[in-house]
């Protein structure tokens, strides 16, 4: 690794210099100076990686290191270096979005060693190149969206390409490195990353410690506007809060009071513009012996907006908002997207209207958080994967007690746990959750994915401060044995940039309900903090604290302006239900774009939201990797843009689960993963005039 500091350009030796000279001789080049976009705050950190000791894709770990369950360590655990934090962040984020087991496909169907044709030819898969790192800000010093551009050494300036890799979830800037960055780097494309203004920013309130852009720590006051995130709390209020609620943490997505989701499309476009600047710095002509001119202008570079989950939603929003031709095409997986639905839109399955579609996340996530623990007790869900560190008896008690409390509140019917659980599950079905996702209702709550999302997004959509303790929830370190809030043996802050996902519980920081001094929300009351879950639900149903307006601010119109686009989603997705996301978006697109639309949709049976869960017993036997189809979709789009190959029409892809014994499923093979068909026949999804009909 070579670092030349902030704002200085990297040159990769004679070969790259020769490319720059050739570029300067091109008569089509302009003498206009390449200027850093005005939204870039401060200077740019530029770092070169040799592809041996360190690299763009694996941080020097290679295929073997990324595949190891042992995280890369720190020489000094209390003060890790920025290079160590980057390595850990790449390791953890890569692994968070794909199945890392060999039987599940890592190293065979995907991975640094697997080439674009699916063959094991790339060895350890290390990729040399340059990174450009900077903040985007609005002048306030409080936005500080992290932008990162990776330019591989194999980038061809005569045939330039960019792929966006907007972070999934609320992850840091490397959050989509396996979902989109890897494919792009193998194609020789520059990668435009951004953290969406959530960025895993944490603020340890008692020590007033924050992270900087590279994950290293600083005092919040001393850091000032260089902080990734500092809670907007006066010193007096902070002292009062710390005395009443010690060992608490603020997180950027939840507590920035900026509703960052409303800007996800905008910052994705900024990441592309920043990538143009970086490419002009490397390949633009020299105009005065030291400064570079503009070789590439908006629209000159083939750019695919790509990512998954929240990053997928951001990509769609960016394509809708693009007015300068920054984005050529879109390829997204399982997009979390809130669609502004026309009243005449219809979503059908097997010719029959589905009971509910197009709900925003604020609606379905708070409902699921309320009902899932009870629904999980249904006998029809027996054998669902168990995804909790709690004893089974504790989890069963939570389910029974949540059902009883829901019944007492008149929110479910039934005289016993089984009838109450059946009613809770029926309500989820009525709210648009597919029966295909039934066996995932329990693990989505048990893993705390749904509670975490409900709390974080409720805070964001109400622009709440950390000191508000919205619905009596907060984020804190706890005693592992009891769940009670407690001072940590060692602060989680040194590693939070490396291992955190931005949505507690994460990186040793838990989601707590503030009963007494505060307890893990699952253990705070017998019914797992029902009062807090009901409060979150009522914020939406009663339109409280500005939530409806802030949710409306994140909605999109499903107008991609005629850009070719592919959406891939698993039918069994129970985190972002397909009726509310992809199906709704495609149906609305039929009105918003009508005849201009070039959008196709591939719905994957036996596909769910978290490929990283696939090694878990019961996941391995039932579900297939959606990531595989995301990669196929990217390849299809590449051939479409480069060669004019038609995109296969919208269709259901009927996969075959691996089966076998939970925890010991047979190895994934191509027989489990049928190709996307050019002629899907009876599996074709019908789309038009505001209606979508998905075959059963």
UniProtKB/Swiss-Prot annotation:
Its main location: secreted. One of its GO terms (cellular component) is extracellular space. It catalyses: (3R)-hydroxybutanoate dimer + H2O = 2 (R)-3-hydroxybutanoate + H(+). It is found in: Secreted. One of its GO terms (biological process) is butyrate metabolic process. The active site is at 309 (charge relay system). It comes from the Bacteria. Pathway: Lipid metabolism; butanoate metabolism. InterPro entries: OHBut_olig_hydro_put (IPR016582). Transmembrane segments: none annotated. Residues 1-20 form the signal peptide. Its EC number is 3.1.1.22. Keywords: Hydrolase, Secreted, Signal. GO terms for molecular function: hydroxybutyrate-dimer hydrolase activity. Pfam families: 3HBOH. Participates in the degradation of poly-3-hydroxybutyrate (PHB). It works downstream of poly(3-hydroxybutyrate) depolymerase, hydrolyzing D(-)-3-hydroxybutyrate oligomers of various length (3HB-oligomers) into 3HB-monomers. Belongs to the D-(-)-3-hydroxybutyrate oligomer hydrolase family. HAMAP family: 3HBOH. This is D-(-)-3-hydroxybutyrate oligomer hydrolase.
């Amino acid at each position: 690794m070579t670092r030349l500091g902030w704002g200085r350009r990297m040159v990769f030796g004679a070969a790259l210099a020769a490319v720059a000279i050739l570029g300067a001789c091109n008569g089509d080049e302009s003498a206009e100076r390449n200027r850093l976009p005005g939204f870039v705050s401060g200077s740019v950190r530029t770092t070169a990686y040799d592809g041996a000791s360190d690299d763009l894709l694996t941080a020097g770990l290679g295929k073997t290191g990324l595949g190891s369950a042992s995280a890369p360590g720190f020489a000094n655990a209390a003060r890790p270096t920025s290079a160590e934090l980057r390595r850990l962040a790449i390791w953890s984020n890569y692994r968070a979005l794909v199945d890392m087991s060999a039987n599940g496909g890592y190293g065979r169907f995907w991975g640094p060693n697997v080439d674009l044709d699916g063959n094991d030819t790339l060895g350890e898969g290390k990729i040399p190149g340059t990174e450009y790192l900077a903040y985007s800000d609005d002048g306030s010093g409080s936005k500080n969206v992290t932008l990162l551009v990776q330019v591989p050494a194999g980038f061809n300036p005569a045939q330039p390409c960019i792929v966006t890799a907007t972070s999934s979830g609320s992850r840091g800037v490397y959050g989509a490195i396996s979902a989109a960055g890897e494919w792009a780097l193998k194609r020789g494309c520059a990668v435009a990353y951004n953290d969406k203004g959530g960025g895993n920013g944490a603020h340890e309130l008692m020590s007033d410690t924050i992270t900087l852009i590279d994950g290293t720590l600083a005092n919040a006051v001393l850091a000032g506007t260089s902080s990734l995130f500092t809670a907007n709390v006066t010193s007096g209020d902070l002292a009062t809060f710390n005395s009443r609620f010690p060992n608490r943490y603020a997180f950027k997505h939840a507590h920035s009071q900026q509703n960052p989701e409303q800007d996800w499309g905008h910052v994705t476009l900024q990441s592309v513009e920043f990538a143009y600047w970086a490419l002009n710095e490397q390949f633009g002509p020299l105009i005065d012996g030291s400064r570079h001119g503009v070789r590439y202008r908006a629209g000159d570079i083939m750019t695919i907006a790509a990512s998954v989950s929240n990053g997928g939603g951001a990509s769609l929003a960016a394509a809708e908002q693009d007015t300068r031709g920054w984005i050529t095409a879109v390829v997204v997986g399982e997009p979390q997207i809130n669609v502004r639905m026309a009243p005449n839109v219809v979503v059908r399955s097997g010719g029959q209207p589905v009971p509910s579609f197009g709900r925003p996340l604020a609606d379905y996530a708070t409902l699921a958080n309320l009902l899932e623990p009870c629904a999980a007790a249904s006998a029809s869900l027996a054998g669902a994967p168990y995804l909790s560190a709690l004893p089974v008896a504790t989890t069963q008690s939570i389910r029974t007690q949540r059902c009883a409390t829901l019944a007492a509140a008149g929110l479910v019917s039934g005289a016993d746990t089984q009838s109450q659980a059946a009613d809770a599950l029926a309500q989820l079905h009525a709210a648009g959750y597919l029966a295909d996702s039934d066996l995932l209702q329990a693990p989505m709550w048990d893993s705390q994915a749904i509670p975490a999302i409900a709390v974080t997004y409720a805070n964001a959509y109400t622009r709440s401060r950390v000191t508000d303790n919205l619905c009596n929830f907060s984020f804190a370190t706890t005693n592992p044995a009891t769940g009670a809030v407690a001072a940590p043996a060692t602060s989680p802050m040194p590693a939070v940039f490396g291992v955190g996902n931005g949505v507690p519980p994460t990186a040793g920081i838990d989601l707590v309900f503030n009963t007494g001094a505060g307890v893990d929300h699952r253990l705070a009351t017998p019914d797992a903090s029902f009062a807090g879950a009901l409060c979150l639900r009522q914020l939406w149903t009663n339109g409280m604290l500005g939530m409806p307006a802030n949710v409306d601010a994140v909605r999109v119109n499903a107008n991609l302006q005629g850009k070719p686009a592919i959406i891939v989603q698993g039918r069994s997705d129970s985190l972002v239900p397909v009726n509310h996301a992809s199906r709704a978006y495609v149906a609305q697109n039929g009105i918003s774009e009508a005849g201009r639309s070039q959008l196709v949709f591939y719905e994957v049976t036996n596909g769910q939201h978290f490929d990283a869960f696939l090694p878990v017993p019961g996941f391995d036997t039932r579900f297939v990797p959606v990531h595989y189809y995301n990669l196929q979709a990217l390849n299809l789009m590449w051939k479409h843009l480069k060669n004019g190959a038609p995109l296969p029409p919208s269709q259901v892809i009927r996969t075959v689960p691996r089966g076998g014994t939970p925890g010991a499923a047979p190895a994934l093979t191509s027989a489990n993963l049928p190709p996307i068909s050019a002629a899907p026949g009876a599996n074709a999804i019908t789309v038009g005039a505001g209606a979508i009909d998905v075959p059963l």
